[in-house]
């Protein structure tokens, strides 16, 4: 049974769940496990722009150095940049301090192995066992303590990496781009990358103050971006979240393009260029049935996984896919990155737009999404999904939807809520079955 790790690292309210004491123990435990070989061991640590990042960063430094690991501090950097730099800087482990799209009050700790991939379940459980144990006999002698220093040049390294994911002959000349960095980790690197590639760049969400990350900006609050794109007659809008591992696109008409539509557009282009390593892509159970029907219609297949980009990536690695992602905008292009990278995904889409010489609206809306309704039911304790009344309601709902729709019920991996999602050709029917299941779950959770 997991105590600390969820579907995307450790996450919770800063100084309540994510305390200095916990961060210290995470640093010590991870440091012990990843000290392999006789070389001088090092860890890279990045963070987003939350006020609590300073506190957690300092505690992690104390933890890693106390077990003899050197620490390289990157400062505010996107999660995918930390993964890339873990490999590039030959680190034994990478750490990202972020709660992604959550408000500033929350924070989290994500860990990457030396290959830049998120840790598997076994390693996370091994770290958990050490966190809850006595670490005193694992501490280094005074002469063997680690050192810590800040690295100043990392922004340029990530910008060059992102630019190199485009063919040399492809530029963004002639594109007016509005980019929303969510007052988060990409506030510096995303606008600079787009500008260096030739775009006319208008930036919003680039004034972090420790409190305003994801506040009315970013991929989970794209209304400001939509308004700016229309107002400035931009060609495209790009919204990143707080740690820039997810992206939402806005076309020139102000219409939103989610992860499903983005994957469809890229999959079609990569299929034509024979760039797909498998004849299909990987998505989660939350991706729209319209995506699956479209992918099948062009001769490709859609593999589904549990929710979470780690499970998408796991399936991609096991079965040889190089394209996958989530409706929420976590897009993984494994030719370039070991995790979701919002900026790289946006660049790959813009490459398709430039190649086709068409407006974003004509490239991105490959299919008509089926009506999809998602509702959350908050609960305090227990397992309401095991209640007989809920089991009966779920079975009845699935019978009503039949072959023309889908029903997905799952507990969130990051907060105490149960998500109820249904989709199908008949919007009224979808709404009815969602309400029925939500009512049953709500009563069981009371």
Swiss-Prot record:
UniProt GO BP: carbohydrate metabolic process; peptidoglycan biosynthetic process; UDP-N-acetylglucosamine biosynthetic process
Q: Which UniProt keywords apply?
A: Isomerase, Magnesium, Metal-binding, Phosphoprotein
> Which reactions appear under catalytic activity for this entry?
alpha-D-glucosamine 1-phosphate = D-glucosamine 6-phosphate
Among the GO molecular function terms of this UniProt record, one is: phosphomannomutase activity
Cited InterPro entries = A-D-PHexomutase_a/b/a-I, A-D-PHexomutase_a/b/a-I/II/III, A-D-PHexomutase_a/b/a-II, A-D-PHexomutase_a/b/a-III, A-D-PHexomutase_C, A-D-PHexomutase_C_sf, A-D-PHexomutase_CS, Alpha-D-phosphohexomutase_SF
Positions of the catalytic residues: 100 (phosphoserine intermediate)
Q: How is it modified after translation?
A: Activated by phosphorylation.
| Protein origin, superkingdom | Bacteria
Family annotation (CDD domains): GlmM
Q: Which residues form the signal peptide?
A: none
Q: Which residues carry this modification: Phosphoserine?
A: 100
**What does this protein do, in the record's words?**
Catalyzes the conversion of glucosamine-6-phosphate to glucosamine-1-phosphate.
Q: Which family does it belong to?
A: Belongs to the phosphohexose mutase family.
Q: Spell out the protein name for this chain.
A: Phosphoglucosamine mutase
Organism equals: Methylorubrum extorquens (strain PA1) (Methylobacterium extorquens)
């Amino acid at each position: 049974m997991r105590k600390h790790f969820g579907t995307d690292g450790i996450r919770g309210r800063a100084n309540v769940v994510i305390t200095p004491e916990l961060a210290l123990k995470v640093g010590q435990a991870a440091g012990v496990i990843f000290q392999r070989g006789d070389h001088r061991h090092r860890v890279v640590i990045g963070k987003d722009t939350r006020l609590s990042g300073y506190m957690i960063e300092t505690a992690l430094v104390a933890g890693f150095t106390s077990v003899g690991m050197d620490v390289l501090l990157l400062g505010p950097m996107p999660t995918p940049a930390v993964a890339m730099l873990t490999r590039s800087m030959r680190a034994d482990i990478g750490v990202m301090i972020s709660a992604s799209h959550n408000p500033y009050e929350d924070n989290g700790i994500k860990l990457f192995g030396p290959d830049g991939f998120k840790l598997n379940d076994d390693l996370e459980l091994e770290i958990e066992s050490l966190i809850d144990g006595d670490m005193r006999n694992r501490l280094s002698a005074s002469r063997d303590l680690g050192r810590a220093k800040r690295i100043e040049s990392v922004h340029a390294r990530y910008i060059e990496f992102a630019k190199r994911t485009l063919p040399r002959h492809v530029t963004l000349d002639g594109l007016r781009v509005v980019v929303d960095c969510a007052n988060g980790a990409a506030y510096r690197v995303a606008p600079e990358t787009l500008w260096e590639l030739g775009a006319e760049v208008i930036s919003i969400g680039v004034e972090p103050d420790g409190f305003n990350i994801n506040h009315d900006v970013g991929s989970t609050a794209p209304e400001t971006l939509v308004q700016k794109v229309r107002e400035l007659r931009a060609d495209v809008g790009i919204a990143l979240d707080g740690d820039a591992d997810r992206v939402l696109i806005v076309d020139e008409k102000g219409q939103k393009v989610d992860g499903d539509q983005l994957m469809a557009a890229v999959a079609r282009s990569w299929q034509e260029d024979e760039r797909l390593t498998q004849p299909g892509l990987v998505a989660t159970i939350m991706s729209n049935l319209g995506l699956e029907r479209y992918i099948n219609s062009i001769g490709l297949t859609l593999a589904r996984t549990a929710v979470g980009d780690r499970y998408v990536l796991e399936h991609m690695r096991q079965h040889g896919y190089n394209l996958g992602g989530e409706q929420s905008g976590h897009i993984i292009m494994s030719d370039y990155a070991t995790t979701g990278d919002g900026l790289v995904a946006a660049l790959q889409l813009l490459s398709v737009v430039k190649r086709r010489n068409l407006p974003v609206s004509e490239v991105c809306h490959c299919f008509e999404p089926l009506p999809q309704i998602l509702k959350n039911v908050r609960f305090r304790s227990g397992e309401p999904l095991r209640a007989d009344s809920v089991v009966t309601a779920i079975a009845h709902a699935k019978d009503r939807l039949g072959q023309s729709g889908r029903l997905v019920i799952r507990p969130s991996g990051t907060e105490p809520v149960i998500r109820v999602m249904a989709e199908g050709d008949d919007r009224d029917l979808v709404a009815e079955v969602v309400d029925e299941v939500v009512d049953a779950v709500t009563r069981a959770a009371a």
